[in-house]
């Protein structure tokens, strides 16, 4: 909210007790995130902002009943598209978990639809009961070694910096463009700097020497640390550390030990990519806070990491604290240790009471379906009969091995079965066939590879959620089932499909860009439940999420080996390699 003279005068009068506040929250224990202390006092709210803490009278009184009051939670790095929900539907889920503000990077929809994709996300996230700030996608496409739906140069992004909810440039992931002095990419960093905006990072696997080069450009945060050493190095060199706990990438338990009383204010908790069923049941960064506390972190420190730390990094001076002049985003907790949420106040209005949405305060007109009319449809070349054949002259091959609950893969060289000069799937060795089909420009590109770790016994899984270019990715035990799953995606204009034998046994349509559902969050949750149940039919019994794991096997900017529509890609050499070793 922009403040004007009348609003400022009114706030001053309430603070000075000349007029009553709109709302006063009484009888609570207030967590001061600046000092770490618990304070007593009334919280006086006017026009959505805190006017003062002390003894106040208001038109409306909310009694906290001696419960703990903390600032609304901030997720400092996430992708709305990964939730498969429209911003409107996502806000209904997040607000119940105390998340009142998110920093969203729309690089998924940006890779599919370019400028139209960013505009869709900005327009669809207007006037929600949470604040959605946008970090502009920095690398569309992620690399030049694949085909995305769009390309975004510095001049394409420049106009967006004037938007009040655009805060900066998101996860700059193309390290090679920095070290090779690629002026087109460097201009994006310069433009962000000239606009007084932030640049955050994405730098897995860099040595300390490479990290110096990376940070010298003005990139000051990273969420891609794979181990304690990398986390410490980033903190030592002045970066903010974003500790990630999502659906596929679960790094909090191993990285939280890095957080100390002296460095904790440089640390945040984020989700990055989390599926809707996990968000609904488990939670967002509220879950991360609970997990951090369970791992031994001081509760106050954990709360700071999703409030004031994030707000200060992103330059949101009126967010992340309970103090005069700050936005009245408040959580009333039954218990601090378990982060059990009783009430949520957004800009001073109680939108969640007793853990349930107050529907009368939650009036939202979801226009996402109409806004999505401008977005492109699936445009793939018809598959030929032998499209998934992998010809081999030797049985020694480069194999992608998935790492459960991680985005990293292992590069293995293994002996494989050959039948009539082509790779033959081995259920016994868990060596399955994988393909990435270009779906934006009907180029006919198909990248082929071998993957292990899914444990599929009979069937195929296909999806249009394939980071970051979001082509179609499919894995399976037979070409016929892979064909069936891919063609079903085309009929739905995107989504997830599981094939077994000659039929589709479960699917989830994602008609908005092949990434987002048009349905409500409870319906999407039910569809995902059916998909998960169908996994057992094709023999999958995994302790990780196969759908999101498959979606990240196509991201070449994460080690060690991935598959794009142009072929197998090795991170170490940052180049293509053949299937045959």
From Swiss-Prot:
<dbReference type="GO" id="GO:0006146">
    <property type="term" value="P:adenine catabolic process"/>
</dbReference>
<keyword id="KW-0378">Hydrolase</keyword>
<dbReference type="Pfam" id="PF13382">
    <property type="entry name" value="Adenine_deam_C"/>
</dbReference>
<dbReference type="Pfam" id="PF01979">
    <property type="entry name" value="Amidohydro_1"/>
</dbReference>
<comment type="similarity">
    <text>Belongs to the metallo-dependent hydrolases superfamily. Adenine deaminase family.</text>
</comment>
<dbReference type="InterPro" id="IPR011059">
    <property type="entry name" value="Metal-dep_hydrolase_composite"/>
</dbReference>
<protein>
    <recommendedName>
        <fullName>Adenine deaminase</fullName>
        <ecNumber>3.5.4.2</ecNumber>
    </recommendedName>
</protein>
<dbReference type="GO" id="GO:0000034">
    <property type="term" value="F:adenine deaminase activity"/>
</dbReference>
<dbReference type="InterPro" id="IPR026912">
    <property type="entry name" value="Adenine_deam_C"/>
</dbReference>
<keyword id="KW-0464">Manganese</keyword>
<dbReference type="InterPro" id="IPR032466">
    <property type="entry name" value="Metal_Hydrolase"/>
</dbReference>
<dbReference type="InterPro" id="IPR006679">
    <property type="entry name" value="Adenine_deam"/>
</dbReference>
<dbReference type="InterPro" id="IPR006680">
    <property type="entry name" value="Amidohydro-rel"/>
</dbReference>
């Amino acid at each position: 909210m922009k403040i004007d003279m009348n609003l400022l005068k009114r706030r001053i009068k309430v603070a000075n007790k000349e007029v009553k506040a709109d709302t006063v929250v009484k009888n609570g224990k207030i967590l001061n995130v600046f000092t770490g202390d618990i304070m007593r006092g009334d919280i006086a709210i006017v026009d959505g902002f805190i006017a003062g803490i002390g003894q106040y009278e208001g038109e409306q009184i909310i009694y906290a009943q001696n419960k703990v009051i903390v600032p609304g939670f901030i997720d400092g790095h996430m992708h709305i598209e990964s939730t498969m929900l429209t911003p409107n539907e996502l806000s209904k889920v997040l607000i119940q978990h105390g998340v009142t503000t998110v920093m969203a990077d729309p690089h998924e929809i940006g890779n599919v639809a370019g400028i139209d994709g960013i505009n869709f996300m900005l327009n669809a996230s207007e006037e929600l009961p949470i604040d959605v700030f946008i970090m502009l996608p920095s690398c569309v496409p992620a690399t030049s070694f694949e085909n995305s739906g769009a390309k975004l140069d510095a001049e394409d992004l420049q106009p967006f910096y004037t938007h009040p909810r655009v805060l900066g440039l998101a996860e700059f992931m193309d390290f090679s463009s920095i070290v090779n002095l690629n002026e087109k990419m460097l201009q994006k960093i310069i433009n962000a700097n000239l606009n007084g905006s932030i640049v955050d990072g994405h730098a897995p696997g860099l040595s300390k020497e490479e990290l110096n080069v990376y940070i010298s450009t003005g990139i000051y945060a990273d969420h891609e640390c794979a181990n304690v050493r990398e986390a410490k190095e980033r903190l030592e060199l002045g970066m903010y550390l974003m500790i990630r706990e999502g659906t596929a990438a679960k790094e909090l338990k191993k990285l939280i030990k890095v957080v100390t009383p002296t460095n904790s204010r440089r640390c945040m908790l984020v989700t990055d990519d989390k599926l809707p069923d996990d968000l609904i049941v488990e939670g967002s960064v509220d879950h991360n806070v609970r997990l951090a506390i369970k791992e031994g972190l001081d509760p106050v420190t954990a709360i700071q990491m999703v409030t004031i730390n994030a707000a200060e990094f992103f330059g949101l001076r009126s967010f992340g604290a309970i103090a005069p002049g700050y936005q009245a985003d408040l959580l009333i907790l039954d218990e601090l240790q378990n982060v059990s949420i009783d009430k949520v106040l957004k800009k001073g209005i109680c939108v969640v009471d007793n853990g349930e949405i107050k529907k009368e305060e939650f009036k939202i007109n979801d226009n996402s379906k109409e806004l999505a009319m401008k977005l492109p449809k699936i445009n793939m070349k018809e598959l030929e009969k032998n499209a998934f054949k992998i010809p081999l002259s030797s049985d020694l091959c480069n194999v992608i091995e998935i790492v459960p609950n991680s985005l990293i893969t292992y590069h293995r060289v293994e002996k494989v079965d050959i039948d009539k000069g082509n790779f033959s799937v081995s259920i016994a060795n868990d060596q399955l066939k994988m393909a990435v089909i270009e779906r934006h420009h009907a180029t006919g590109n198909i990248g082929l590879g071998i993957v292990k770790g899914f444990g599929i016994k009979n069937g195929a899984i296909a999806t249009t959620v394939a980071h970051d270019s979001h082509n179609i990715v499919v894995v399976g035990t037979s070409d016929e089932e892979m064909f069936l799953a891919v063609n079903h995606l085309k009929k739905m204009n995107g989504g997830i499909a599981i094939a077994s034998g000659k039929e589709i046994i479960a699917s989830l349509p994602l008609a908005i860009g092949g990434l987002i559902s048009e349905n409500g969050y409870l319906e999407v949750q039910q569809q995902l439940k059916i998909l998960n149940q169908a996994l057992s039919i094709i023999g999958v019994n995994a302790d990780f999420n196969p759908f999101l794991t498959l979606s990240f096997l196509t991201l070449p900017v994460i080690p060690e080996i991935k598959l794009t529509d142009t072929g197998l890609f090795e991170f170490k050499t940052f180049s293509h390699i053949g299937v045959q070793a």
